[in-house]
Every structure is written in structure tokens, then in C-alpha cells.
Amino acid sequence: MDAALYFPRLLRAGAGGAAPVAVAASGAVAGVYVRTDVQRGVWRAPAGTDARVVGTVGPEVRLTDGQSGELNRQGINVIRALPGHGTVVWGSRTLRGADAMADEYKYVPVSRLALHLQDSITRGIRCTTFEQND
């Protein structure tokens, strides 16, 4: 329930003025998650125009609106270069988020909030593990 897929890879500047190099988006997307958590909370989607990907030249592949929509319907989140916003994460579906599936954990913020609550409750009641339960 807590996995998501992001496409395409990102381009980072090449060393010493060399051509840009394609790298996996996972590190940059993790950074967007952390920034979203700190600024807005785990219950907010790490996507949209506020979800800028910093430190990259841009996405390896430029997607059209139609291509982005089709990938999103399949549960694949896209990384897009939007005029006026830069490179952003555009989509917040889990791997259970394809339109063909009806799943309560279809979206990243729902899944992450459930995991956060589970962890918080577990930590909160740990001190009562060996208490009597009559």
C-alpha cells in the first residue's frame, strides 16, 4: 500500500559542463516528500505546483497532457516541466492507484496518513504492553 512509481527519470547537470546525465527520480521525489511533510503535513499530497523538484535540469522526457493523463490512469505519477513552475511532481497515486482498481489506498497521502497514524498509535501505547487488561 505504500509504494509509488514516478516517471520519467531526471536530468542533472553533467560534471564540468558535460551533457546532462539521466538519474533515477527516487532521491528527488523523496526530497519532495520530506519538504511536503515539514511544510504541509503527511496528509497532503506531495504533488502539484508546490511540489517542485530542485537541483535538476528537468525531466528526461517531456510529456504532453494526454500522455500524463494516460500514465496517471495507470497509477504512474509523472514528473513534468511546467512553464512558470519548473520541474514538478504531477500525481500522487500509489501502485494500487490505477483507475481500473477501486482501492481505499489509491492515493499517496491516504496511504501515508494511515501509516503515520498506525505508527503513532503503536508508539503511544507501547508503555502498556505488559499492563493488566481486566
Tell me what each language-model feature is.
Residues 1-134:
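A glycine- and small-residue-enriched flexible loop/hinge signal that marks low-structured segments
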